[in-house]
């Protein structure tokens, strides 16, 4: 293998373009991400990137290959309007031989070609030392910390009961009925969140098509008087969770409409989802929260969640 392999892409032009990877290419990158995630304990690609790869969305990507021709490293750059988000992943068996450096250099060229040098964010999932070194080598600085918090099995077994405000009821999501109402509440609840608040109907449909989606696990808080949606807790339990370790559930998203603040819905919804996942037999529960969202961090800490890992987002100063 070459010490500094030249990344290949599905686009033969010298000028960088946003393209759609072939299905077999996308599948290979997703398999690579699964291998790396299993080895590192941290998923190297965000859900949005995985969804785009799976559905054939448009993005820039580059890859390195081993002597057998198999993809052993990949960089994925997802355009978001005038900005972009970059993620890199290298097979655990192909590290420390220049794969990450080659991919980062190719991605930097792509960012320049796409005129997004000042608006591209780069994720270092798990803040692995190699990823942090690459970010610094390219003159990037951390601008955001995403904490991964975990609720232990003991804490999960000792959860307090759910207390709902008067006039509020809980129910499961109904496909074909609740999509627009959910999108409206999600957009309002996450108006300042760069990923969650921008979800579209297509994004929602893609997630509903995932094998882990469970309509009853997307809990909705509604006003009894008129059925108006006030908030939600979207839980996530992978079908094969627990196959190679603890069975992990996830607080995928908790959102409360701004005009329903003050009713204690954030705590009630979080607890309701945790109880449901406990009934499903999960061993522990994870969640992701921005470090500067002090109110949410305080809520989760009060329920027994502890810091487990962290992701860092880098950008040019």
UniProtKB/Swiss-Prot annotation:
Keywords: Acyltransferase, Repeat, Transferase
Highest taxon in the source lineage: Bacteria
A Gene Ontology molecular function term of the record: mycothiol synthase activity
Family: Belongs to the acetyltransferase family. MshD subfamily.
Protein's UniProt name: Mycothiol acetyltransferase
Region (Disordered): 1-24
Binding site for 1D-myo-inositol 2-(L-cysteinylamino)-2-deoxy-alpha-D-glucopyranoside: 47, 195, 236, 250, 288
EC number: 2.3.1.189
Binding site for acetyl-CoA 1: 88-90, 96-101
